[in-house]
UniProtKB/Swiss-Prot annotation:
GO CC terms in record: cytoplasm
Gene Ontology molecular function: any one: arginine deiminase activity
Protein name in UniProt: Arginine deiminase
Organism: Streptococcus pyogenes serotype M49 (strain NZ131)
Lineage, highest ranks first: Bacteria, Bacillati, Bacillota, Bacilli, Lactobacillales
One GO term of the biological process aspect: arginine catabolic process to ornithine
Gene that this polypeptide is encoded by: arcA
Catalytic EC class: hydrolase
UniProt similarity note: Belongs to the arginine deiminase family.
Pathway(s) where this gene product acts: Amino-acid degradation; L-arginine degradation via ADI pathway; carbamoyl phosphate from L-arginine: step 1/2
Key word Plastid present: no
Cell compartments where the protein resides: Cytoplasm
Reaction catalysed by this enzyme: L-arginine + H2O = L-citrulline + NH4(+)
């Protein structure tokens, strides 16, 4: 990394030097059973224990010499002037789907009154309950204020924020600032916008943008994997459109970030396989985790760029051989989540047994609960750093989902 290129990520496995996390906060306590589906959760984590688990995750990374950055801190540091701060508040409000004019005015006054930038950022993440606002005089209420009185939130919380992998993705020296699948999560990308526009280290045009949050088609970071300095992998999934991938790839190739080919993986479109990294991650030079249930239906396309056009070829044959050829290794070992047992594979994939974070070649952070997959990984010679995640996993994400590398050593 240099002062000119504060982002440097050219693999999934190079020694991790710097990573972005978000410690779960009050946004988790604003989850309610009646609105879980709306907020993309299946259950409600116990915040106190989720924070302990996340703190242990962050400490495990620090113990390996990795610098841990906090999303809320970087976002707060990006609000460097009163003008930027006010612009952030206004943009946040415009995207918050606030239904009543009087309600919007009251929330703006609440946010403008928060003097500390970090406190302001944390409040925008937590959401705003209607009970926090002063009573609006009947004479000032619009029709929306009157008829939507039962829903408890004036602004929804953002409980998925601890999955920092998805709102934006670091690719080479650039960043894909994503347009996300759901309105609930798309608001999360606002923090990335301000970080990469206004932060003293990461803003000011120092980081090339290869996708824009204002695009109309959707893409998420869990579907963006950097296999090597030459090859990317992208997933066509529940959360990422093929059209978005084409836009992303044209931008990557045009900006000469160094990549020569992209492997596009098309697989089952459902919640349990929501991203490529929930079923497929790289753990060593020649080893990948994979969920066996996707192998039969998986289609892979090779994408290159020449004469200002994308050239797309559907690949046939064995996936391991395809990966080996593209990575320049003799053989690739596809390590099945849960082994060959269908029940174990389903259970451990649901608990993110395939969603590993590689912090150096052959050194992998995993949830300790996926005992069968972990034993198989260890039998293959991998060093595992096991973390507790009984509460964190309720959000349906593992160590890779909860981390966004900012700097890796080259391999």
């Amino acid at each position: 990394m240099t002062a000119q290129t504060p982002i440097h990520v050219y693999s999934e496995i190079g020694k991790l030097k710097k990573v972005l996390l978000h410690r779960p906060g009050k946004e988790i306590e604003n989850l309610m059973p009646d609105y879980l589906e709306r907020l993309l959760f299946d259950d409600i984590p116990f915040l106190e224990d989720a924070q302990k688990e996340h703190d242990a995750f962050a400490q495990a990374l620090r113990d390996e010499g990795i610098e841990v950055l906090d999303l809320e801190t970087l976002a707060a540091e990006s609000l460097g002037t009163p003008e930027i701060r006010e612009a952030f508040i206004d943009e946040y409000l415009s995207e918050a789907n606030i239904r009543g004019r009087a309600t919007k005015k009251a929330i703006r006054e609440l946010l403008m009154a928060i003097e500390d930038n970090q406190e302001l950022i944390e409040k925008t993440m937590a959401g705003v309950q209607k009970s926090e606002l002063p009573e609006i005089p009947a004479s000032e209420k619009g029709l929306t204020d009157l008829v939507e009185s039962n829903y408890p939130f004036a602004i929804d919380p953002m409980p998925n924020l601890y999955f920092t992998r998805d709102p934006f993705a670091t690719i080479g020296t650039g960043v894909s600032l994503n347009h996300m699948f759901s309105e609930t999560r798309n608001r999360e990308t606002l923090y990335g916008k301000y970080i990469f526009t206004h932060h003293p280290i990461y803003g000011g045009g120092k980081v090339p943008m290869v996708y824009d949050r204002n695009e109309t088609t959707r893409i998420e970071g869990g579907d963006e994997l950097v296999l090597s300095k030459d090859v990317l992998a992208v997933g066509i999934s529940q959360r990422t459109d093929a059209a978005s991938i084409e836009k992303l790839l044209v931008n990557i190739f045009k900006q000469n970030l160094g990549f020569k080919k992209v492997l596009a993986f098309e697989f089952a479109n459902n919640r349990k396989f929501m991203h490529l990294d929930t079923v497929f991650t790289m753990v060593d030079y020649d080893k990948f985790t994979i969920h066996p249930e996707i192998e039969g239906d998986l289609r892979v396309y090779s994408v290159t760029y020449d004469n200002e056009e994308l050239h797309i070829v559907e690949e046939k044959g064995d996936l391991a051989e395809l990966l080996a050829a593209n990575l320049g290794v003799e053989k690739v070992d596809l390590i099945r989540c849960g082994g060959d047992n269908l029940v174990a594979a389903g259970r451990e994939q649901w608990n993110d047994g395939s969603n590993t974070l590689t912090i150096a070649p052959g050194v992998v952070v995993v949830y300790n609960r996926n005992t069968i997959t972990n034993a198989i990984l260890e039998s293959k010679g991998l060093k595992l750093i096991k973390i507790h995640g009984s509460e964190l996993v309720r959000g349906r994400g593992g160590p890779r989902c909860m981390s966004m590398p900012f700097e890796r050593e080259d391999i």
